[in-house]
Amino acid sequence: MDRPNKAIYLYQTSKGNHEIRTIQEPYVPKDAQSLVDVQYSGINPADTRHVYMDMSNYVAGYEFAGTVKQVGPKSPFKIGQEIFGISIPYNNRPNYLGAHQSFLLAENFMTFARPDHLDPITAATLLAGGGTAMDGLLNVLGYGFPPAGIPGDDPTNVPILIWGGAGGVGQAAVQLAKAAGFFPIITTASQQNHDVMKQLGASHVFNYKSPSVVQDIRNLLESKGWSLKTVFDAVSTGLGVFDGLTEEQEKAVQQKYNQSSSAMARQCCDPNIPDSELRLTSVLPVKMDPNYVFCLNFRPVEILDIGGEVTKDTKEEEMTKWKEWQPRIEKCIEWLIENHEKHWQPPRTRVVKGVEEGLQGIRDVWQGKMSREKLVIDHRV
């Protein structure tokens, strides 16, 4: 740590505030840890949302790319090696896990070697959206991924609706669905993003702002004889969960549940398919519909108590699933690292310089000022 370790710190207030701090504590890698000189870190809505999920009081940020400076005795990496990864969120986690700082300690979990053909900015934006899309498609929805030899139900020519294709998770889901063999791949996006969505692999794109969007999608499905039972809500808007709302405000939002992305996406499904056969996943818990299952970007051995989701499984059953699901995510990530040049177009990125600009970037992302754009902090200033 040859320079001041400037960081963006998340502390708990009713507004989920961040502030810039210089971290004084030295980071010394132990066991399988690696000390990383951070080049870039990716900004995500979770940088703010997690305070409303009772997670705070730590250095913010999850996605990172950088250079190994020191290693613990069990680290799989070498000094000077380029790596990237994503860290686990939890309340009062150690400062050394935060991505939005000059240096961090990377655990072995969800950390990968970065080959020369994968540039650091792409690497620093890959795992939050990509991992969530993988968990949704391969684990929650239960499909295989033939290109990587991941078993599961055959996705070939299975219709899928990805609501919110222009966001980070949506773009990843569209591209992975294309590689897996889903068809048709139907998505929603603002009108200005329709051409890009088709370039990424969507076969049909609808404007989610249109008052007739649900009927338009159903008309397409009926005209083609396609039966839709698979939905990936990649935005989960209008649910009122983890948005920093008061209890009264949350109830008011939930009273308008039929206007939420989750409700509208489900309304597009074949009405003749029973609930038990629907495959629905979302990026936030859907309290009003237990048929939706919340997807994450990784499945650690210790289950994260995030709350808000209705589940019929016991904790032991959940843990068994998570142990089976995490290797599937990692195998798909490894496939994507090797094949990203053919199958992956990263989100449009804008680099901000240092934690000062990064702090404003976090606020802009949370306020929804980005459209099909990912902000990345350059810590080499």
Swiss-Prot record:
Superkingdom, taxonomy of origin: Eukaryota
Keywords, in A-Z order: NADP, Nucleotide-binding, Oxidoreductase
CDD domains: enoyl_reductase_like
SUPFAM superfamilies cross-referenced by the UniProt entry: GroES-like (SSF50129), NAD(P)-binding Rossmann-fold domains (SSF51735)
Coiled-coil blocks: none
Annotated binding of NADP(+), by residue: 46-49, 166-169, 189-193, 208, 255-256, 370-371
InterPro entries, per the entry: ADH-like_C, ADH-like_N, GroES-like_sf, NAD(P)-bd_dom_sf, PKS_ER, Trans-enoyl_RdTase-like
Gene Ontology MF terms: nucleotide binding; oxidoreductase activity, acting on NAD(P)H
EC id: 1.-.-.-
Enzyme class: oxidoreductase
Binding site for substrate: G130, G131, T132, A133, M134, D135, G136, L137
Pathway annotation from the record: Mycotoxin biosynthesis
PANTHER family: HYPOTHETICAL OXIDOREDUCTASE (EUROFUNG) (PTHR45348)
Subunit (UniProt): Monomer.
Family that this chain belongs to: Belongs to the zinc-containing alcohol dehydrogenase family.
Function: Trans-enoyl reductase; part of the gene cluster that mediates the biosynthesis of fusaridione A, a bright yellow trans-fused decalin-containing tetramic acid with antimicrobial activity. The PKS module of fsdS catalyzes the formation of the polyketide unit which is then conjugated to L-tyrosine by the condensation domain of the fsdS NRPS module. Activity of the Dieckmann cyclase domain (RED) results in release of the intermediate fusaridione A. The unstable pyrrolidinedione ring of fusaridione A is opened through a reverse-Dieckmann reaction to afford its ring-opened form.
Protein name, UniProt field: Trans-enoyl reductase fsdC
